[in-house]
Structure formats: structure tokens, C-alpha cells
Regions:
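Bacterial N-terminal signal peptides that target proteins for export
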Residues: 1-7
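Bacterial N-terminal signal peptides
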Residues: 8-16
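Short secondary-structure boundary motifs at beta->alpha junctions and helix caps
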Residues: 58-71, 130-178
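Surface-exposed short loop/turn segments
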Residues: 22-28, 86-136, 142-151
Length: 179
């Protein structure tokens, strides 16, 4: 009897973080205004599915916040929309080059911004441009989004994703490799 009781307590404690997690509906759409023109790139380009290397629930944004779908899918969508916004015509097969992404970490902090308590979400995503059987270019994008705490985790995630896109499309070396 004691063994059952102990196992039940361990089971409940082990799944308690999942029960207290807050689910966030993420309806991300890139609405930024980067001025990078990808319409004249000379190679066919594909974005591979983003991999999540954090080793936790794939829907985890950070701390106790879960998205309705895996964070890797949300980041994929952000990269796709950001490149399309610049006129890139992305392909699904027979590509000359592909972009591979890997989520390294996500961290949520509460910070003071000029007397305003704010949420700061940082998502680190390693991105590599592959072509001709090798890595041509790679970097780690630091998507840091900071918003007043009242705006919530959804707004912090949107700001973080916008920053991921800006860092990618404004990287001179990335742009050079696509020409």
C-alpha cells in the first residue's frame, strides 16, 4: 500500500509542471518592414524543418508557457515569411541551397526597462546555409523580444520572432552567399 502511495505522489509531482503550464495561442505573421530584396537571388532556396535541440516539450516557449504547436514550426513559419517578404521564391524540392535551423535555447526573464516591468524572451536559433554538399554559412540568431509585462508572452514571442527574421535577412554574409 505504501508503495502505491509513494508511486502516486511521485507521478503527481512529476507531471505537476505540465498541469500548471499556460497554453498560448500563437498566430504569428511577419509584419516587419525589412528592405532586403531576395527576388533576384540566383539559386533555388529551401527552408528545412527547424529542429528543436532543447530536449523539452516541443511546444515549450519558455518557463511554463506552451504554444499550441511546436516552437520549431513557429520559427520555421517566421523564417519562411521573412524571406518571402523580401521576394524570395522558396522551393520544396530540387534546391541549390537550403537553410537548416536548430533551436538551441529559449529563456524568459522579467526585466526593468526605464521603470517598466517587462518580459524579455530570448530564443537562440542556430541557422546554417547548406549547398554543394557543405555548410556555406552559419550563425546563431538571437531573437530577443522585450515587451511590457501587461502585453504578455504572446507579444514577447512576436517581438522575438521579428528579431530572428531581421537578424537573418540583414546578415551581409548570408546575403552574399545567396548571390
Amino acid at each position: 500500500m505504501k508503495l502505491r502511495y509513494v508511486l502516486a505522489v511521485i507521478f503527481c509531482l512529476g507531471f505537476n509542471p505540465l498541469m500548471s503550464a499556460e497554453e498560448v495561442i500563437v498566430d504569428y505573421s511577419y509584419n516587419g518592414n525589412h528592405n532586403t530584396d531576395f527576388s533576384s537571388i540566383s539559386v533555388s532556396l529551401k527552408i528545412e524543418n527547424v529542429i528543436d535541440d532543447r530536449g523539452s516539450d516541443p511546444r515549450l516557449i519558455a518557463d511554463e508557457y506552451l504554444a499550441e504547436k511546436p516552437l520549431s514550426e513557429i520559427i520555421y513559419t517566421a523564417l519562411f515569411q521573412g524571406l518571402e517578404h523580401g521576394g524570395a521564391e522558396l522551393v520544396t524540392s530540387d534546391q541549390d541551397m537550403q537553410i537548416q535551423g536548430r533551436i538551441v535555447s529559449s529563456e524568459l526573464r522579467t526585466v526593468d526597462r526605464s521603470g517598466v516591468e517587462s518580459l524579455q524572451l530570448t530564443i537562440r536559433t542556430q541557422v546554417a546555409l547548406q549547398g554543394r554538399g557543405r555548410t556555406i554559412w552559419e550563425t546563431t540568431l538571437f531573437g530577443r523580444g522585450t515587451v511590457p509585462i501587461e502585453e504578455g508572452i504572446g507579444a514577447a514571442l512576436t517581438a522575438s520572432l521579428d528579431r530572428v527574421v531581421r537578424e537573418l535577412v540583414n546578415d551581409d554574409y548570408f546575403i552574399i552567399e545567396l548571390q
